[in-house]
Amino acid sequence: MDKAKLKEELTKRISSPVLENEPLAQHTTWKIGGPADFLIEPQSIEELSLVIRFLTENAVNFRVIGNGSNILVLDRGFRGVIIKTKKINKVEITAGGQVFAEAGVLLPALAARALKVGLSGLEELCAIPGSVGGAIRQNAGAHGKEIKDVLKRVWTINERGELKEFFANECGFKYRSSRFKEEKQWIVKAEFSLNPGDKKEILKKIREFREKRLASQPLEFPNAGSVFKNPEGIPAWKLIKEAGAQGLKKGGAMVSEKHANFIINTGGASAADVIYLINKIQELVWKKFSVKLLLEVEVLGE
C-alpha cells in the first residue's frame, strides 16, 4: 500500500491527526531516534482496535509504544506506523476500591490517583516514567516490587482487533518480561489489586521512593532508565563500574557517573553513539567477568 493511501485509510479510523515523517526523538525519553513513516495517537480502545485490525489485514509494519521510556529508536527511524497509546488514558476507581487504568496512563499519575482515595500498593512503582501498558508488557519494577505484584487482570487486543482478558497468573510474568513481549497481543487496560491505607503513610512512602530515585539516577539528562538487565545475584551497574566502563563517552552519549547502568544523552546523542557504548560495555564486562549483559531497553527501527 502506498503512503498516500495508507494515510487516507488511517485518517478514516482515528479522530486525531496522522503525523507523517514524525521524528521519534520527540516521543522517547532518550530524545533519540529518526522519523516514523507515520505516527498516530488513537483516542480510545475502539480506535486502537480498528487500526490494529486494518494494519494486520494489510500487512503494514507497525509498533505500539507507550511513553517511549524503555526504547532506543535507531537513527534512520521506523518504516511503518507507530501507534502511541498516550490518549488511551482513562482511570476508574470504583466505590468498592477496584482500580482500572487504560494502557496510556502513566504510573506516577496512577499512583497519585490511588493516593487521593487512600489506596496503597503502587508506592514503589510511583517514579517509573512508563505507561501502564509498557510497564505490564515488560513487568517493570523498582525497590523490590514488580507490577505483577499489584496486578489483577489485563485486557488486550489481538491482530483481529478482538478484546481478550487475562488474569495476572496467566500473563507469563518473568524478570522484565511477560507473554505480551512474544505474542501478538497489545495491552489496552488493566485492573489493579490495591489495599486501603493511611494517606499520610502512602504519601510518605511515595516521597521516600522519589527522593531515592532523584539521589541515585541521572534524571537531569534524557535517559531510558536501566539499559541492561541485572544478571542473577549481582546488579548490572556494579559489573559496569568494576569493568571500568563508567564515564565512557561517544558523541553526545555517556555512561552516567551517577548510575553506571544508565546511558545519558548529554546533548545531540545519536542512536549510533548509544549502540557503540552498549557494545563497549558488554565487551568490557565480558572480558573482566565472563558475564554477558542482556539489554533491558528495546531497540526499534533501522
From Swiss-Prot:
Source species, domain of life: Bacteria
Enzyme Commission number(s): 1.3.1.98
Keywords tagged on the record: Cell cycle, Cell division, Cell shape, Cell wall biogenesis/degradation, Cytoplasm, FAD, Flavoprotein, NADP, Oxidoreductase, Peptidoglycan synthesis
Enzyme class: oxidoreductase
GO molecular function: FAD binding; UDP-N-acetylmuramate dehydrogenase activity
Localization in the cell: Cytoplasm
Active site: 176, 226, 296
Pathway assigned in UniProt: Cell wall biogenesis; peptidoglycan biosynthesis
Keyword match Cell wall biogenesis/degradation: yes
Keyword Ribosomal protein in record: no
Segments forming domain FAD-binding PCMH-type: 31-213
Gene Ontology, cellular component aspect: cytosol
Cofactor field: FAD
Annotated GO biological process: cell division; cell wall organization; peptidoglycan biosynthetic process; regulation of cell shape
Catalytic activity: UDP-N-acetyl-alpha-D-muramate + NADP(+) = UDP-N-acetyl-3-O-(1-carboxyvinyl)-alpha-D-glucosamine + NADPH + H(+)
Pfam family, one: FAD_binding_4
Function per UniProt: Cell wall formation.
Sequence similarity: Belongs to the MurB family.
PANTHER family in the record: UDP-N-ACETYLENOLPYRUVOYLGLUCOSAMINE REDUCTASE (PTHR21071:SF4)
Protein name: UDP-N-acetylenolpyruvoylglucosamine reductase
Source organism of the structure: Carboxydothermus hydrogenoformans (strain ATCC BAA-161 / DSM 6008 / Z-2901)
Taxonomic lineage: Bacteria, Bacillati, Bacillota, Clostridia, Thermoanaerobacterales
